[in-house]
Amino acid sequence: MQGPLYIGFDLSTQQLKGLVVNSDLKVVYVSKFDFDADSRGFPIKKGVLTNEAEHEVFAPVALWLQALDGVLEGLRKQGMDFSQIKGISGAGQQHGSVYWGENAEKLLKELDASKTLEEQLDGAFSHPFSPNWQDSSTQKECDEFDAALGGQSELAFATGSKAHHRFTGPQIMRFQRKYPDVYKKTSRISLVSSFIASLFLGHIAPMDISDVCGMNLWNIKKGAYDEKLLQLCAGSSGVDDLKRKLGDVPEDGGIHLGPIDRYYVERYGFSPDCTIIPATGDNPATILALPLRASDAMVSLGTSTTFLMSTPSYKPDPATHFFNHPTTAGLYMFMLCYKNGGLARELVRDAVNEKLGEKPSTSWANFDKVTLETPPMGQKADSDPMKLGLFFPRPEIVPNLRSGQWRFDYNPKDGSLQPSNGGWDEPFDEARAIVESQMLSLRLRSRGLTQSPGEGIPAQPRRVYLVGGGSKNKAIAKVAGEILGGSEGVYKLEIGDNACALGAAYKAVWAMERAEGQTFEDLIGKRWHEEEFIEKIADGYQPGVFERYGQAVEGFEKMELEVLRQEGKH
C-alpha cells in the first residue's frame, strides 16, 4: 500500500504537465501534453494564436480542457492509482485571464463522467480565448493605470508593479471596452491558476494570494482590491460588478478549498476525500520548488535573465515586481526580468573566439578563460579606473533603453564617471564586463532586501542559486558569487523544466500535512533532499571583493542615470 500522493499541475504557454510526488517529495509520475504536438483541432503555434494587427497573443481555453483530459489519461496509462491522491495544486502562466459565461457553475456542477471535459465545458466561457503574457495590446490602458494613483511609483507601491501590457487589470479594462456585451455576460473572471483549481473543484475557485498580485489591481499592503483601480478597470459596469466577477481572495495559500468534484471520482477513481488547494502563478511556484528561504536569491540565466528572491522587505519600484509570497505571510516574492541575458553574453563569446581564430565560435572555453584572467572591474592596479558597461543587443526594460552599447570609466575615490576613451582591450575586457554588468544590476536593484548573516558581515543573500543555460558556466558562477555574495555560497540547481510543477506539488504536500502554524519552509525544508537537486559551484561572499563591488554598484547606478539622461529618458 503506497502512502499518500500529491499532484502539481503546470499550465504554461506550450504544455500542461502533471507531476506526482509522495510525502517524501520523491517524483513518482509525470504526464505531459504538448499543445503543438498533441492537440487536435487548434491552429496554434507555440501554444498560442496571434492577431498581429492589434498586438494580441492569446490561447483557446478549450485547448487547455483537451490537455487536462490528455494528462489525466496519461497518468492512467502509467498505472497510477488515483485513489492515493490526497491533494492537488497547480501553477499557471501568470497574468492570463479566463472569462466564464453565465452557465459556467451549472456546467461545472453537472459533468457526466462518461464524457471528456472538452466535450462538456466548451460552452462554459463567455469568451473562448485567454490573453497570453506575450500580448502587448494594452498600451493605452497601461498609461491610464500608471496615471490612476498619481504615477508609476505610486502604482508600484500599491500593487507591487507599475502597469505592464500582460497584467490582468489592463487586459480586463481593454476587454470590457472591446467586447462590452460579452463582458456584461461574463459571470466570473479567473486567473489561469484559479481556472485549474476550478476545473477540479466543480465550481469557480478563488484567486491565489500571490498570483492576484500580477493584476495591477490588488493593493498589497491593504490586503484588498484597490477601489480606485477597480473603478478605472470596470468602466460603466461599475465596481461592485467587477468585484463579483473577481471574487474573494483567501489569505492562506494552503487553505482547503474543498473536495474534488465527483466527476473525477467516477471517471478516474480519485478518492472523494482528495482536497483541492489554491494553485499559484508559475514564478511563485518556482520559489516553492527550491524551497527558497528568506534572503535566498535565484538567478535564471536563460535567453532573458530573471531574478527571484524571498524577502521580508517590501520596497517596490517601477523597475521591479513584488508579489505576496505564495505560502508564507510576512514574506514577499521579489522579481526582476531583463530582456538581455544569454544573447548578450553569446555575442561577446563569439567575438572573443573570432579574435582568437577559434572554431566553432560557440565554445565557452575562451570566454571563461578570459573572464577569469581579467581582474575585477578590469582594474590591474588600485589606481586604475573601474571599467563599466551596458550591453543591450535588444531594447531593455530595466532600465528602459534602446539597444546599444555604452562603456565608461569610473573612479570610486572621487565618484567621477567618464565615457571610456580607448582604455578597453576589446573584445577581451568585455567578457568579464558583461557578466559584471548583469550581476551589478541585480545587486543594485535588490539593495535593502537582505540581512547580515552574522557579526561584521555585510547584508547579502544566504545562498545564490543559478538555473538555466548560464548556470553550467563556472566563470559566470564565480563572478556571480563575488558580486552578489552568498554567505553559504553559489549553487547550481538541477531541477530541469519541472520547477513550476514541483513547487505546486510541494504546496499540496504542505497544505495537507502541515502541523498547526507550521510554515512551508519548515515542513518542506525538513524533507527536501538538497543533494539530489543542488551542487555548490562557487564561493559566495569574499571579504574585500564584495565591498569593492559595492563601490562599483554606485558607479553602475551613476552610469545608468547618465545614459538615460543622454537618451532623453531622464
Curated annotation (Swiss-Prot):
Enzyme class, broadest EC rank: transferase
Binding-site list for substrate: H95, R166, D282, N283
EC number: 2.7.1.17
Signal keyword on record: no
Induction, as annotated: By D-xylose, L-arabinose or L-arabitol.
Catalytic function, reaction form: D-xylulose + ATP = D-xylulose 5-phosphate + ADP + H(+)
Localization in the cell: Cytoplasm
Keywords: ATP-binding, Carbohydrate metabolism, Cytoplasm, Kinase, Nucleotide-binding, Transferase, Xylose metabolism
Binding site for ATP: W364, G469, G470, N473
Superkingdom of origin: Eukaryota
Gene3D superfamilies listed in its UniProt record: 3.30.420.40
A molecular function GO annotation: D-xylulokinase activity
Family under the similarity heading: Belongs to the FGGY kinase family.
Name the record gives this protein: D-xylulose kinase A
